[in-house]
Structures are given as C-alpha cells and as structure tokens.
C-alpha cells in the first residue's frame, strides 16, 4: 500500500499513511525504514518519496500541454510587472514559455537559460542574452559551472523562474545543478517571481 501511494503521488506524508493503513505511527515508521533499507523509497522529513532514480522528470514538451489556461493567465500577470528598460531573467520552463509569448516590448533586455526561449525572443526582435553551459535534456535549461559563472556576472531587475514543486516555505527542483542555477538567479535579481501553476 505504501509503494502504491508513492507510485501515484511520488511523495507521501507519515500522517496520510497512518490514516490510510489505519495503524500506529511507529508501525508506519518501521515499515518506511524497512522499505528504505531495500532502496524502494527515501525517507524525508514527515514522510517518504520515491528514490531519485524512480522520479523521472517530465520533459518540457509533456509539461507544456498541461494547465494551459492557468499558465497563460500567470504569464499575462507576469508580463504586466515588466517595466521600461528592465533587464529581466526568464528561466527555462513550460510556464515561462507562456511569458515569452506575452512579451511584446522592445525596450527591455531578456536574459534566458533556454535555447527555445532565446529563439522566440530573437524572432520578436527583443534584445536577448542567452546563458551558456551544459543543456539539461528534459527542460532544455543551461546548467553547470559555465551557466553559474555567467549568471553571477549579471544583475536583473526582475527574474521569472519556474519550479517543479512549491511547498510551504520552499520551492523544489529534482536536479541539483538546475537548483544551483535557480539559486544564483534569485541572488542576482532585485525582484523574483516564481511562475507555478496549481499542479505544483
């Protein structure tokens, strides 16, 4: 039952398992410890998650067809926040791709770590800077040391970033290198906006 829940949701809380299994917290903890020793799950604070090897991240193409209307509304709101002469960072991602579609201003500079975003921006004749580095296949995001070095040399008026998950007090992404890039963006922006739909 525990592995079945993890298969559906990728993460499960201790509280939820106690209710589902109708058993004590200590019994659930023991079961989780046993499953972790068999590498079938990974214990996290307050519950468990699938081991990273089983958490396949959806590709940018798979994400781009989900929650279209919500992503469009988020992008419209984000575009309304951009001011004349802003230097903005637009992160790789499916929701941020909708922001690129909303951008019409030529009086801004857009920095991005997405090959696809850069092509669309150049087609719109919007001044564009693309971050180099290795490319993460599932998200088309530039990652690694080269990307970090470039980002750390720049400053942004506003940054619009995507995340894989949003939880109380923190954001998540399953890739450490991509996480490091997002952290650098946050540190180099005057204002940062996380563009995340309700599936996060």
Q: In which residue ranges do the predicted regions lie?
A:
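HTH-adjacent hinge/linker in prokaryotic transcriptional regulators
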Residues: 1-22, 26-92, 100-109, 121-126
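Short beta->alpha connector loops
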Residues: 93-95, 199-200
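Short hydrophobic/aromatic-enriched beta-strand-loop microsegments
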Residues: 107-114, 127-133
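Alpha-helix/helix-capping structural signal
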Residues: 94, 115-116
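Conserved phosphate- and dinucleotide-binding cores of soluble alpha/beta proteins
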Residues: 4, 11-17, 22, 37, ...
């Amino acid at each position: 039952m525990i592995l079945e829940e993890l298969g559906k949701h990728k993460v499960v809380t201790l509280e939820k398992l106690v209710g589902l299994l109708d058993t004590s917290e200590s019994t659930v903890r023991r079961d989780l410890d046993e499953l972790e020793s068999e590498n079938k799950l990974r214990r996290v604070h307050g519950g468990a998650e699938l081991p990273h090897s089983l958490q396949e991240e959806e590709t940018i193409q798979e994400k781009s067809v989900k929650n279209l209307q919500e992503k469009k509304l988020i992008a419209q709101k984000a575009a309304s926040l951009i001011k004349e002469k802003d230097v903005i960072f637009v992160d790789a991602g499916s929701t941020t791709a909708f922001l690129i579609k909303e951008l019409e201003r030529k009086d801004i500079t857009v920095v991005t770590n997405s090959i696809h975003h850069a092509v669309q921006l150049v087609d719109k004749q919007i001044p564009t800077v693309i971050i180099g580095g290795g490319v993460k296949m599932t998200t088309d995001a530039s990652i690694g040391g080269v990307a970090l070095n470039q980002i750390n040399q720049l400053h942004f008026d506003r940054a619009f970033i995507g995340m894989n998950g949003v939880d109380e007090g923190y954001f998540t992404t399953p890739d450490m290198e991509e996480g490091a890039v997002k952290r650098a963006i946050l540190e180099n922006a005057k204002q940062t906006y996380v563009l995340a739909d309700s599936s996060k």
